[in-house]
């Protein structure tokens, strides 16, 4: 379209396999940040997420045509090598994006899902693409600088993989998480039953279990992300059913992003009224609540449900219920004190 930024500013576009905006051009940064600000300002988004594309991957572009941009940088007194300059372009954009999003909305989270290997040999025995040196993504720096609220390295390999060990990479990223940001690795559900190297139906549930074990370690993962949605919707080899009936059987509150807002919402008022074979659970309104967490104990076993704050009443089966607890949950995951009912 004539209004497209690439049409209006062809001087910023580089062709290499596809069309790319040159990360070395300040106007490219300005445009991308302006678009993100506009989206966050006008739409009720929970987060801004960017994927693993920075400079092109070498399988699509072997020599990015930015020599004129780099020469202009050098003529202006710049002394960084080409690789360091490219990484600096990406680093400055990531930092600026993080600050800009929060200037527009303090509770909007910023996340990145980089290639799962920072550099080969980190940790020892890891082989594969050097994202630091080929797409100029110094993803460890973004995590350790606190320029993300959640970090989702694409750990798209199996537990048994030798050169790209899922457990080894998971543990290594936890060690790098010195700012204690949310570490939510990406899991390759798209590989279940498909080439290359098809996963079994048990692979993803096993990885989820490892992630949960890692949550107990310092800086460890507190969740995971399945890629992609199609594999979940089509329930490849029944893996989604297995998760729903097992590891994902109960709802969960997303971990609180306390560095954005550490104040818990006010406790809810709770009313529980018997109604035939059901109990009608009603909570008060709370201006800070985005969700409310409903937990109830049936014959000694807890069940739970996460309910939108716009819904004030939920009916549960009364049989065997010996306690009900509700909490308000705000937009960044802070939970209020318990409101408790006992029969």
Question: What is each of the regions a protein language model found here?
Answer:
Residues 71-125, 129-195:
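Glycoside hydrolase catalytic-domain groove-lining segments
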Residues 139-140, 144-162, 173-260:
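Substrate-binding cleft of secreted/luminal carbohydrate-active enzymes
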Residues 284-299, 321:
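Solvent-exposed loop/turn segments flanking beta-strands in beta-repeat/beta-sandwich domains
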Residues 243, 248-287, 334-343:
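Pro/Thr/Ser/Gly-rich low-complexity, intrinsically disordered linker/stalk tracts
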Residues 1-42, 134:
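Active-site-adjacent "subsite" loops/lids of carbohydrate-active enzymes
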Residues 316-335:
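Beta-strand-rich modules
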């Amino acid at each position: 379209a004539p209004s497209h930024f690439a049409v209006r500013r062809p001087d910023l576009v580089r062709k290499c396999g596809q069309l790319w905006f040159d990360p070395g051009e300040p106007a490219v940064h300005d445009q991308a940040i302006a678009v993100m600000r506009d989206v966050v300002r006008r739409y009720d988004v929970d987060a801004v997420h960017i994927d693993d594309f920075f400079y092109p991957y070498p399988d699509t572009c072997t020599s990015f045509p930015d020599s004129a941009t780099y020469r202009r940088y050098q003529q202006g007194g710049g002394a960084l090598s080409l690789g360091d300059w490219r990484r600096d372009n990406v680093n400055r954009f990531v930092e600026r994006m993080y600050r800009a999003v929060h200037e527009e909305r303090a509770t909007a989270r910023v996340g990145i899902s980089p290639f799962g290997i920072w550099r080969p040999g980190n940790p020892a025995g890891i082989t594969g693409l050097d994202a630091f040196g080929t797409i100029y993504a110094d993803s460890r720096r973004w995590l350790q600088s606190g320029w993300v609220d959640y970090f989702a390295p694409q750990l798209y390999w199996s537990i048994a993989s030798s050169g790209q060990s899922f457990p080894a990479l998971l543990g290594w990223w936890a060690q790098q998480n010195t700012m204690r940001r949310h570490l939510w690795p990406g899991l390759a559900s798209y590989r279940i039953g498909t080439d290359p190297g098809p996963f079994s139906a048990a692979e993803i549930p096993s990885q989820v279990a490892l992630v949960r074990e890692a949550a107990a370690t310092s800086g460890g993962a507190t969740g995971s992300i399945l890629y992609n949605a199609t594999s979940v919707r089509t329930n490849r080899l029944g893996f989604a059913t297995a998760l729903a009936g097992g590891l994902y059987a109960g709802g969960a509150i997303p971990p609180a992003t306390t560095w954005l807002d550490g104040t818990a919402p006010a406790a809810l008022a709770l009313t529980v009224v018997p109604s035939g074979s059901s109990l009608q659970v009603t909570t008060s309104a709370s201006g800070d609540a985005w969700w409310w967490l409903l937990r109830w104990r049936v014959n000694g076993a807890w069940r739970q449900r996460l309910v939108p704050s716009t819904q004030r009443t939920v009916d549960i089966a009364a049989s065997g219920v010996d306690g009900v607890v509700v909490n308000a949950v705000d937009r960044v995951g802070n939970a209020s004190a318990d409101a408790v009912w006992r029969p």
